[in-house]
A protein has these predicted regions:
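Secreted/periplasmic proteins
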Residues: 19-177
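Sec-dependent bacterial lipoprotein signal peptides
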Residues: 1-19
């Protein structure tokens, strides 16, 4: 009888853990300390202005559903991006210089850490900007503001804007609108 009860407890525990979901999101503002990856140093900082031209890449299914650097769940079907140094979450405008397509994206992750790439986009963002198949594109990135924690990333086709864009720029001491 004791063995039966023990087996039932083990089976019950397996059923409960088998039904558990992935990581729980806990979004938070993040700047972070300097860090080194693949021999390169990155120095995150709070900015009120940022503009750069460089190479964008995209990342997808291996990271879908995992926690981002600021504690949100990565959704490869949302319009998001990863940047090595901008405060998280941020809002940027990314323009594909080859075709002129432009998107406003939520930056909620760190990366890319390959070669001299400037920004990593979600699969949805790469599709919208027209470089999913090529994998890389030369882009212009402009910082628009700090994103709010209570906003979810926008998906293609949604008709809304980030509320943070109507806010005044926050200070490093107060990262909320």
């Amino acid at each position: 009888m004791r063995r039966f009860i023990a087996w039932m407890l083990v089976a019950g525990a397996l059923v409960v853990t088998g039904c558990s979901s992935g990581p729980s999101p806990h979004p938070h503002f993040k700047i972070g300390q300097p860090y080194k990856i693949n021999g390169n140093w990155y120095h995150p900082e709070f900015v009120t202005e940022y503009e750069a031209i460089g190479i964008a890449s995209w990342y997808g299914s291996p990271y879908h559903g995992r926690l981002t650097a600021n504690g949100e769940l990565y959704d490869m079907y949302a319009l998001t991006a990863a940047h090595p140094t901008l405060q998280l979450p941020s809002v940027v405008r990314v323009t594909n210089l080859a075709n002129g397509r432009s998107l406003v994206l939520r930056v909620n992750d760190r990366g890319p850490f390959v070669d001299d790439r400037l920004i990593d986009l979600s699969l949805a963002a790469a599709r919208e900007l027209g470089f999913e198949r090529q994998g890389l594109a030369r882009v212009h990135v402009v910082y628009l503001g700090t994103a709010r924690l209570d906003e979810k990333p926008i998906r293609p086709g949604e008709r809304r804007e980030y509320a943070s864009l109507s806010c005044q720029l926050p200070t490093p001491e107060r990262l909320v609108c």
